[in-house]
């Protein structure tokens, strides 16, 4: 009887934890299929990345040049830290601020989603398409 209660307790605990795993998956700021098909917001983030020519400092694959490798940085930075860096810059390190850029302020969520997807290895480098 005690074994049955123990197993039932374990099953209950695992069932209670399962929704937490689903929530974590739902917290992903992007949707991607096949490595290059992404949701509309993430696609706008990629377009913003390209329009601002961010690859001049961070590399075409976000692996860094004179600027840091964003595929590593976005593994550590929270969305709030990323937003703060984009809007305020890091002048001491050569990172300009973009708080006056309408393109950035309107697409900051998409830019974060794109770079986070790259850092997570879910989004492949190169041209993206909209996920339909």
Annotate each language-model stretch with its function:
Residues 5-6, 53, 91:
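Short hydrophobic/aromatic segments of transmembrane alpha-helices and their interfaces
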Residues 25-41, 51-52, 93-132:
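Flexible coil segments in periplasmic/lumen-exposed cytochrome c-class electron-transfer proteins
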Residues 35-47, 56-97:
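Gly/Gly-Pro-rich "capping" loops immediately C-terminal to redox-active cysteine motifs
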Residues 19-20:
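N-terminal signal peptide c-region/cleavage motif recognized by signal peptidases
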Residues 1, 24-25:
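N-terminal flexible/basic segments that precede or flank functional cores
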Residues 8, 55, 64, 77, ...:
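A broad, structure-centric signal for solvent-exposed, well-ordered loop/edge residues
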Residues 1-10:
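Bacterial N-terminal signal peptides that target proteins for export
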């Amino acid at each position: 009887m005690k074994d049955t209660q123990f197993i039932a307790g374990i099953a209950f605990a695992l069932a209670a934890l399962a929704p937490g795993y689903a929530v974590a998956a739902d917290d992903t700021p992007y949707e991607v299929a096949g490595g290059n098909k992404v949701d509309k917001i993430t696609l706008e983030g990629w377009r913003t990345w390209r329009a601002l020519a961010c690859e001049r400092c961070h590399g075409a694959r976000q692996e860094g040049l004179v600027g840091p490798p964003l595929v590593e940085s976005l593994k550590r930075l929270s969305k709030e830290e990323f937003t703060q860096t984009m809007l305020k810059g890091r002048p001491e390190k050569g990172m300009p601020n973009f708080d006056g850029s309408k393109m950035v302020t309107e697409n900051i969520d998409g830019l974060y989603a794109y770079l986070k997807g790259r850092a997570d290895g879910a989004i492949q480098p190169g041209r993206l398409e909209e996920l339909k």
